[in-house]
Amino acid sequence: MFKQSKLVSALAVAGIALFGASAAQAQIVKIDGSSTVYPITEAVAEEFQKAKKNAIKVTVGISGTGGGFKKFCRGEIDIANASRPILKKEMEACKEAGIEY
C-alpha cells in the first residue's frame, strides 16, 4: 500500500508539473522499469488519466529495474519503477547527468 501511495503521489506531482507546460506541448508522463511494479503502475496510470480526462498521457513500459534507472538517469523517462533501492553507481550516473530526484 505504501509503494502504491508513493506512485500515486509521484504521478500527481508529475501531472502538476506538466500543467505548467504550454498548451502546444504534449503532456506525457513516461514511466519505465520493474516488471514487478508494472501491474500497479499501469492501474494507477489508467485511473490518473481518467481523473485528468486524458489531458495527460501516461506511458508505462517494462525494461527491468536496472533498465528503468538507466533510462531515468539519461532523462528518457520521468519516473523509474523499481523493485529495489537505487544502487550507488546509478545514483552517480544520475548525478553526472544532472538528474535530481
Task: Tell me the role of every PLM-derived stretch.
Residues M1-K3, A24, K50:
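Intrinsic low-complexity, intrinsically disordered segments enriched in polar/basic residues
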Residues M1-L11:
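Bacterial N-terminal signal peptides that target proteins for export
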Residues F19-A26:
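Sec/Tat signal peptide C-region and signal peptidase I cleavage site
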Residues K6, F19, I31-D32:
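Intrinsic disorder/low-complexity segments
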Residues L11-A14, A24:
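Cleavable N-terminal signal peptides
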Residues Q27-Y101:
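N-terminal segment of the mature folded domain
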Residues V13-L18, T41:
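Short hydrophobic/aromatic-rich motifs at helix boundaries and adjacent loops
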Residues L18-F19, Q49:
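A short hydrophobic/aromatic micro-motif that marks alpha-helical segments and, especially, helix-coil
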